């Protein structure tokens, strides 16, 4: 196709406009009319102004972007408008965008190409309407009107072309966006393709590696099979040889070979057993270290728990009503539920008392006064011995861990102190007291700790302090009942450990030995008949158990005393009664008991107040127990009271003393380790 035929109609329009402008600007040879001759230069310029405007419009029309590829344009206004409406429809984009470009290109209707022109010739402008004919050269006004009409038509056509141009630009922008999207997709797909190719190469390499490994294993398997066949053949050959050997020499050689094989196998077994033994020893050492660490952590947490509970704790126990005793009135003793509700063990009790003095003065019934007390734990009359021991089992464990421990039983005579510490009649395991139960617990735990490398030894002693005199309750033979020679001394100069001279220190290792010692001490203890109790303990009994532990593998040692003290019962004597020889003895005993108990209270208060001087020496009891009462010890006091209303005064005194002790704090306990 000729180049001239491919020119767009817009260039042809531009060329026709330029020709028209030249025609307007050219001077005509027709004489001007009078009206035209009368016009001045300004009026001529106004007359020619439409031509100038038409020239500027044509110049603006010619400023079309020719940098992009030219496609076929629509030839008519209706085609352009239809094409513009088509562009406003929904755009459909295919998977790769190629179909969208094809749709845009197909939507453009081709314009019939102009006939080919020869060089140097111009194409006549497209005339939409018909003119009457060519005006004469002198009819400039008519020519001007024609040109204005033609300019109007060209303006309309220019607007149409501008609309078409905007539509084409919009199409171009959409195509460019689609091309950008397709380029991005292409880059993404190329990256995915590269990744897939990389993985394929890696899989191929792995496949090659695995194939090589398979070949290697197949080769190894073939070698093993050949070796197995060779060995089987050799075995058959040896069997044939053995069956064919008949001489004594060959028989001896066979036996020699068998002996060598057995020896080699035995040596291999020995080596294997040695390795296993070494591994077991290593594992045992590791487990021992771990077990030791866990044991130390248990001791630390156990001691921390005991410190949180308090290094001085007070438990209250109310004995049950015995046969022949009057039942107390309802509401005399009330046990409120624990802090967590009815299921929680009680920690307080309320005691009601009527004021007889006020009743005597006024003559009216005395009102009831209620006294409330709170302790770490309260045991009602129905509490069992096992339940009581469960509360102090952790404290007994602290003694095994190296902390000095002292447990008191305090209260008036007949309140159940001895029953709490030693228990009831022999032979009934349900009535065993704290001492036999504590010993059973210590022996059991020591046996378990032996598997961790700990070795424990226990040495027991049992003394009583009667009228400030120390007596050995384990004395036998001629020394039985003669405790005046016992004195409290230092074990060695400069040592903090105390010992009782002339007292028996018996090593114990089982429950039967402890039971025999308790039976002997029970027979030797000083008792007397009082108004409150037919067999009242008139002395303080102190059961001391010195615990020594050693871990030879780690070079550790620990030791601490466990003191279980049954304090003497207090009982007031009527000062108006005539004192016979027996009553004078009871008075001296009561004075000594009250003095030692008062000193015990002063010592505890001094320790709580961090006083520089603690009056340990004011009493034999506190002097003997001073290493178990200080800041490095743990102490527990049982206050035993009677449930009878006739003993309400003594019960109140005991509860008030116990409340003072419960408010004391003696500091942080420390283990005795070396």
UniProtKB/Swiss-Prot annotation:
GO terms for biological process: cell division; minus-end-directed vesicle transport along microtubule; mitotic metaphase chromosome alignment; mitotic spindle assembly; negative regulation of centrosome duplication; vesicle transport along microtubule. Gene3D superfamilies: 1.10.287.1490, Kinesin motor domain. Its main location: nucleus. Residues 146-315 form a coiled coil. Residues 75-84 have a biased composition (Polar residues). Residues 311-664 form the Kinesin motor domain. SMART domains: KISc. ATP binds at residues 411-418. GO terms for cellular component: early endosome; endocytic vesicle; kinesin complex; microtubule; mitotic spindle; nucleus; spindle pole centrosome. Residues 336-345 have a biased composition (Pro residues). Highly expressed in 14 dpc embryos, spleen and NIH3T3 cells. Also expressed in testis, brain, lung, kidney and cultured astrocytes. Very low levels in skeletal muscle and heart. Residues 66-96, 327-366 are annotated as: Disordered. It comes from the Eukaryota. The modification Phosphoserine is found at residues 28, 33, 35. Keywords: ATP-binding, Cell cycle, Cell division, Coiled coil, Cytoplasm, Cytoskeleton, Endosome, Microtubule, Mitosis, Motor protein, Nucleotide-binding, Nucleus, Phosphoprotein. InterPro entries: Kinesin-like_fam, Kinesin_motor_CS, Kinesin_motor_dom, Kinesin_motor_dom_sf, P-loop_NTPase. The modification Phosphothreonine is found at residue 360. GO terms for molecular function: ATP binding; microtubule binding; microtubule motor activity; minus-end-directed microtubule motor activity. PANTHER family: KINESIN-LIKE PROTEIN KLP-3, PROTEIN CLARET SEGREGATIONAL. Purified early endocytic vesicles bind minus end-directed Kifc1 as well as plus end-directed Kif5b. Addition of anti-Kifc1 antibodies leads to a decrease in minus end-directed vesicle motility in vitro. Belongs to the TRAFAC class myosin-kinesin ATPase superfamily. Kinesin family. NCD subfamily. Minus end-directed microtubule-dependent motor required for bipolar spindle formation. May contribute to movement of early endocytic vesicles. Regulates cilium formation and structure. Binds NUBP1 and NUBP2. Interacts with PPP1R42. This is Kinesin-like protein KIFC1. It comes from Mus musculus (Mouse). The gene is Kifc1.
